[in-house]
């Protein structure tokens, strides 16, 4: 069978657990992603099984003889290095970035600090711990401003604020999901996203997707549960803009130490067409509305082959030492 244009020995993949569901605020989306991945792998003849860490102990993976895991978990405990660390201890290879890269990428503030240090463009921001500090951030960054939890995804807990009065409620909402609240400069312009596949020097960007949401509001509902959002792939952007985005996202991916696959979100500022990195998702959605499969289709890679190729890239952070025998 083929994945990413290469031949893959399905039997060599062994017994596979598709990790789905979990305990995060993104459980519903994860169940949809995992169900799609499971069907795709089964269609290739992979010995794949659904496994929900919210309902079963991860230690059962070893007891039941699983050889590798496809992580279709999103958000806390699945995308933040937690499950990756458990799988490292169990010695079971898994898809996506490793422990440190997953943990850093889940923390938007830490990610932005690293990107800025490396000279990568990202919107200005403030870390706040109260509604009062949120108001002060609005004065510093200007309106409108984005207020969101530092460690959530799928726009959960996110608010776009225009006035000081809106800051209080926005802070309360974001802090329900994370004590660390990020206030971020709003970039007016084109919203785009770009997947990256591969590892190290082999990492490469897939085609850019341009997103046009109703009234510019690409929220949780418009991401997953409506058909009102329009996705353009090919993006329709000038060739030099697309090339620059692809170059930046590969740098962003490598800078955080990612491997396997991820997807970066970028805004292109309307005033000067400068791209700004917003965040990187280390376990992107794989639902019917998801963007990595859409980008892959644009270069002739089917959903089924995409899933197989990602699974084949499963790895551990470090080689497992041989067990010593008494």
UniProtKB/Swiss-Prot annotation:
Keywords: ATP-binding, Cell shape, Cell wall biogenesis/degradation, Cytoplasm, Ligase, Magnesium, Manganese, Metal-binding, Nucleotide-binding, Peptidoglycan synthesis. Mg(2+) 2 binds at residues 279, 281. One of its GO terms (biological process) is peptidoglycan biosynthetic process. It holds the Pfam family Dala_Dala_lig_C. It is found in: Cytoplasm. Gene3D superfamilies: 3.40.50.20, ATP-grasp fold, A domain, ATP-grasp fold, B domain. Binds 2 magnesium or manganese ions per subunit. This is D-alanine--D-alanine ligase. InterPro entries: ATP-grasp, ATP_grasp_subdomain_1, D-Ala_lig_Van_CS, D_ala_D_ala, Dala_Dala_lig_C, Dala_Dala_lig_N, PreATP-grasp_dom_sf. The lineage of its organism: Bacteria, Pseudomonadati, Pseudomonadota, Betaproteobacteria, Burkholderiales. Its main location: cytoplasm. It comes from the Bacteria. It catalyses: 2 D-alanine + ATP = D-alanyl-D-alanine + ADP + phosphate + H(+). Pathway: Cell wall biogenesis; peptidoglycan biosynthesis. NCBIfam families: D_ala_D_alaTIGR, PRK01372.1. Its EC number is 6.3.2.4. Cell wall formation. Belongs to the D-alanine--D-alanine ligase family. SUPFAM superfamilies: Glutathione synthetase ATP-binding domain-like (SSF56059), PreATP-grasp domain (SSF52440). ATP binds at residues 138-193.
């Amino acid at each position: 069978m083929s994945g990413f244009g290469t031949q893959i020995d399905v039997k060599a993949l062994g017994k596979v657990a598709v990790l789905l569901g979990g305990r995060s605020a993104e459980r519903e989306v994860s169940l949809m992603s995992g169900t799609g991945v499971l069907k795709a792998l089964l269609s290739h003849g992979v010995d794949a099984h659904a496994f929900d860490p919210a309902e079963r102990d991860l230690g059962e993976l070893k007891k039941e003889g699983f050889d590798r895991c496809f992580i279709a978990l999103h958000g806390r405990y699945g995308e933040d290095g937690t499950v990756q660390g458990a799988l490292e201890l169990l010695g079971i290879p898994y898809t996506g970035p490793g422990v440190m890269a997953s943990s850093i990428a889940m923390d938007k503030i830490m990610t932005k600090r690293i990107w800025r240090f490396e000279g990568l463009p990202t919107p200005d921001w403030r870390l706040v711990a109260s509604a009062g500090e949120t108001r002060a951030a609005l004065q510093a960054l200007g309106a409108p401003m984005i207020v969101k939890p530092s460690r959530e995804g799928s726009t959960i807990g996110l608010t776009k604020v225009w006035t000081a009065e809106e800051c209080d409620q926005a802070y309360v909402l974001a802090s329900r999901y994370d004590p660390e609240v990020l206030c971020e400069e709003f970039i007016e312009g084109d919203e785009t996203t770009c997947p990256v596949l591969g590892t190290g020097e082999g990492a490469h960007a897939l085609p850019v997707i341009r997103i046009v949401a109703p009234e510019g509001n690409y929220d949780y509902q418009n991401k997953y549960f409506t058909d009102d959002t329009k996705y353009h792939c090919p993006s329709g952007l000038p060739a030099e803009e697309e090339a620059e985005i692809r170059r930046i996202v590969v740098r962003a991916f490598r800078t955080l130490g990612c491997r396997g696959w991820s997807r970066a979100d970028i805004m292109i500022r309307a005033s000067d067409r400068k791209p700004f990195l917003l965040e990187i998702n280390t376990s992107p959605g794989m639902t019917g509305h998801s963007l990595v499969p859409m980008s892959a289709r644009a270069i002739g890679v089917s959903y089924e082959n995409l899933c197989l190729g990602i699974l084949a890239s499963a790895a551990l952070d470090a080689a497992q030492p041989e067990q010593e025998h008494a």
